[in-house]
């Protein structure tokens, strides 16, 4: 058996050495991206032409660029392709009759999809990504945990990330899910706020060879907040100052995803009252936690709440946010199940408006 195996391997090595695609094969098996691959030009095009779209749509737009220029990707969805926006860039389905396809229709098999992607990532040569609703991560959590444990580069495209999905109601509206996923070691959980952050998050996920990524994406459209070019991938630091206070700073608003634009509205109202407010986009808590102490202190100075009040805003559980707001800070969130109604009505009902949040901040400052 050993002799046969040795002979077969030698024959395979000889074929590989003579093959014209040897370098490409070895690059892909090593998990390296092509040297020419970059999303910089695409991101600049987003900055040049701002648009209001859901981040699930922003992800589809980015995937159009990725799949057209990176042959390593193989996508799919657990029976929600049209909702997850995961099929883009001209890729066709992978079938028994056509194995050149790069898209898999997994059916209603969330755990099977996640487990299959783990296998593909561990084999090497491809970068698998797959989509479902964020609330359905409960169905594939064990496989997501193994992605992290086995250091597998898998990208989970999890859409409909909050009460913003609307009428499907509390069975489909994530509350505790984002924070519970953040608790898994070696798993990046990213919640981008607009088209630019979404593209940045995809770029990070593709370059993370030894850990998986969850992209938490909206159903509802979001305004584009990033309209100026940056010298680096700002999302790569996990969090960054999107807006600096104009008046003397009294408040730091820390928000994620769809609530970042709300934080900018709150900041504008506070400024009218002479209260300066920074807006920090917390794209990925894990990446932020990995930054050096100097950067973290620059963004979240270690001063008393009497000097600077920290406020977190996320349309999910408030559990865990005291890590960033400190115990005397203010945490805006949802600690109950959602409801069935249009997204705008739900955000108003659950207090996710500047009119509801700013008075809470003022009371805290004056308390």
Annotated model-derived regions:
Residues 1-109, 119, 252, 256, ...:
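Conserved acidic/glycine
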Residues 34, 132, 281-283:
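Residue-level recognition of beta-strand->loop/alpha-helix junctions
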Residues 56-65, 139-143, 199-203, 294-298:
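Short alpha-helical segments and helix-capping/turn motifs at coil-helix boundaries
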Residues 62-69, 76, 83, 116-123, ...:
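Generic, well-ordered alpha-helical scaffold segments in large soluble proteins
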Residues 69-73, 98-102, 123-127, 149-154, ...:
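Short coil/turn connectors at secondary-structure junctions
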Residues 76-77, 106, 129-130, 156-158, ...:
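General beta-strand structural signal in soluble alpha/beta enzymes
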Residues 81-179, 197-200, 207-367:
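Thiamine diphosphate
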């Amino acid at each position: 058996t050993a002799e046969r195996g040795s002979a077969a391997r030698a024959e395979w090595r000889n074929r590989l050495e003579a093959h014209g695609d040897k370098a490409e094969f070895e690059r892909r098996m090593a998990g390296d991206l092509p040297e020419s691959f970059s999303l910089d030009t695409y991101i600049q095009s987003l900055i040049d032409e701002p648009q209001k779209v859901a981040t699930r749509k922003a992800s589809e737009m980015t995937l159009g660029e990725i799949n057209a220029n990176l042959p390593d990707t193989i996508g799919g969805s657990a029976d929600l392709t049209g909702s997850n926006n995961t099929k883009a860039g001209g890729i066709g389905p992978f079938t028994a009759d056509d194995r050149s396809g790069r898209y898999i229709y997994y059916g209603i098999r969330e755990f099977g999809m996640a487990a299959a992607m783990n296998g593909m990532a561990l084999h090497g040569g491809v970068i698998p990504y797959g989509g479902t609703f964020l609330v359905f991560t409960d169905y594939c959590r064990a496989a997501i945990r193994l992605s992290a444990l086995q250091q597998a580069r898998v990208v989970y495209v999890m859409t409909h990330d909050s009460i913003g999905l609307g009428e499907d109601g509390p069975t489909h509206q994530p509350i505790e899910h984002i924070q519970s996923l953040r608790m898994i070691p070696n798993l990046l959980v990213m919640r981008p706020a607009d088209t630019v952050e979404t593209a940045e998050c995809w770029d990070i996920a593709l370059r993370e060879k030894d850990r998986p990524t969850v992209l938490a994406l909206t159903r509802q459209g979001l305004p584009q907040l990033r309209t100026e070019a940056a010298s680096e991938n700002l999302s790569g630091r996990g969090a960054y100052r999107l807006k600096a206070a104009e008046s003397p700073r009294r408040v730091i608003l820390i928000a994620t995803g769809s609530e970042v634009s709300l934080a900018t509205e709150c900041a504008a109202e506070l400024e009218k009252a002479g209260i300066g407010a920074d807006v920090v986009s917390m794209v990925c808590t894990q990446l932020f936690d990995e930054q050096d102490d100097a950067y973290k202190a620059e963004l979240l100075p270690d001063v008393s709440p009497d000097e600077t009040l920290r406020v977190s805003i996320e349309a999910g559980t408030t559990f865990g946010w005291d890590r960033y707001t400190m115990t005397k800070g203010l945490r805006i969130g949802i600690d109950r199940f959602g409801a069935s109604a249009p997204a705008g009505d739900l955000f108003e009902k659950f207090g996710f408006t500047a009119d509801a949040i700013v008075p809470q901040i003022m009371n805290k400052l004056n308390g």
